[in-house]
Amino acid sequence: MARSPLPWLVIAAILALLAGVLVPSLVVGRSIRLADDVEFHAVTEPAAVLVETGTTTVRMDNTYTTSPNEEDDALVQLDTTKDFYRMPEGQPENRSAHLSASLTLNRESAYPEAGHASHQSFAVRQLNLGASIDNGDMEGLTAFFPADTEQRSYPYFDFIAQEAVPIDYTGKSKRGGIDVYEFHQHIDALPAQDILARTAEYATENDPTFTPEDLRRRGRAGDFYTNEELAHFGLKKDTAVVLDSFYSVDRTVTVDPATGTILDLDENISFVWATDAKQARDTSIPPERRAVFVGDLHWDQTTQDAALELARPTVRLHKAMGLVSWVGKGLAVALLAAAGLTYLRRRDHV
């Protein structure tokens, strides 16, 4: 009597099911960890922005570099820099601001790892301001989102505000054939005095000549406001005013949800002198004489293409593993069906 194929069909079905479940899970789980060898350079389109001396052209260069953590494979070191360059027509470009940061990220969540100090340094030529900052536990996302990004809000760290502010999911679209999520963050008229106080709390090195009074302007309203603004705000030219600086930003981030890679970044930044937050929010008239920095910075197309290429191999791998999972589970069902038929036929012959 021939040996029944039933046991082999059952074993094959179990193996197919395991292959369809375990292999994709292991491969995808390994692939979504934040890589420890990322080198990414982002550049914004040259943009016309308002500054205290008038309109100028500016671009921002941003680098992200990850490297292995020597103590724990579950962590990765992130080093990032931001450089703002003025590009005066007919003159060499010059760096007007620089920021660098070094922190330890969790490779699974992309958040700063608790208990690991971060270091920042920045210099702003226009304000004659510079500082080095050692934070305890920095909170919020920075250069990456978590893999398997969800349609929800996340805390996102703003290096100027020096705090994590929610960034909200706003919708999805497609970029280069990839499904992407869009997030938006709004920081509203934050007084620079508050930023300075927050910075001073962790500062290890400050410019000793810089004081809170340097973030304030005093004088006649006519020295700071155009005639149109004077009428709009109900001020007279000889009215004495005290202006503080306020920081606002509308930030739109486009993310590949499979890998957490940021694919596009748009930042509408407003740093202005104003009597109060309400006046700082009023952008109905361009603040031609009150602008520290007012402009929209958006990644250029080359940067967007490079970000897509950074994410695409993992996206393809996930699609391939989805197919492996479907085939494995389908084969398991087919083999179990064959085993069932074999069992019924065998029982009918008994």
Please report, for each region that a protein language model flagged, where it lies by residue.
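Solvent-exposed N-terminal domain segments of exported/luminal and surface proteins
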Residues: 2-130
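Glycine-centered flexibility motif
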Residues: 12-18, 35, 146, 171, ...
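Proline-rich low-complexity regions
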Residues: 33-41, 144-147, 226-229
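N-terminal short leaders/motifs
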Residues: 115-132, 201-215
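Membrane-proximal low-complexity regions enriched in glycine and acidic/polar residues
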Residues: 154-271
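Membrane-proximal extracellular "stem/stalk" segments
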Residues: 236, 240-324
